[in-house]
């Protein structure tokens, strides 16, 4: 049986964090942010990033984990957030995933794994796209898509 993870999703400033904190206090949980902007250090204004007062002593994960100049992908998020979830579960606590970035939430909950691509691989794909065009790459993608 899969471990329990509580997910709260919705638009920015809709009360997700306040609800997550209340539930964490009630159920013995910790909050894992699923917001594509709250991961960045210094991006507090306009992201509704919770203040220490709003956190009310509840541990929050995946806040301020990257510099705004860094590349940050859904794959990187899923690896880091999965480690947070595993750690929370290992301590007998409830992970409460709260945020509005559906791409992050969907991939985290689905447990998707992502391959690591080197710069060389990207260069090869870009060269092929220039030479053969994007339709050729699209056709290759269809070979690996089960519902195409």
Regions found by a protein language model. Name each.
Residues 1-146:
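Phosphate/pyrophosphate-binding catalytic cores of soluble transferases and nucleic-acid-acting enzymes
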């Amino acid at each position: 049986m899969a471990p329990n993870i509580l997910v709260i999703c919705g638009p920015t400033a809709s009360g997700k964090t306040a609800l997550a904190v209340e539930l964490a206090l009630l159920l013995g949980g910790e909050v894992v942010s699923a917001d594509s902007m709250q991961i960045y250090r210094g991006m507090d204004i306009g992201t509704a990033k919770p203040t220490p007062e709003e956190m009310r002593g509840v541990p929050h994960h995946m806040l301020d984990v990257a510099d705004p100049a860094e590349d940050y992908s859904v794959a990187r998020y899923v690896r880091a957030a999965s480690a947070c979830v595993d750690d929370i579960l290992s301590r007998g606590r409830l992970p409460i995933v709260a945020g509005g970035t559906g791409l992050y939430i969907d991939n985290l909950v689905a447990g998707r794994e992502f391959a690591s691509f080197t710069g060389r691989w990207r260069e090869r794909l870009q060269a092929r796209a220039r030479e053969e065009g994007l339709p050729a790459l699209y056709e290759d993608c269809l070979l690996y898509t089960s519902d195409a």
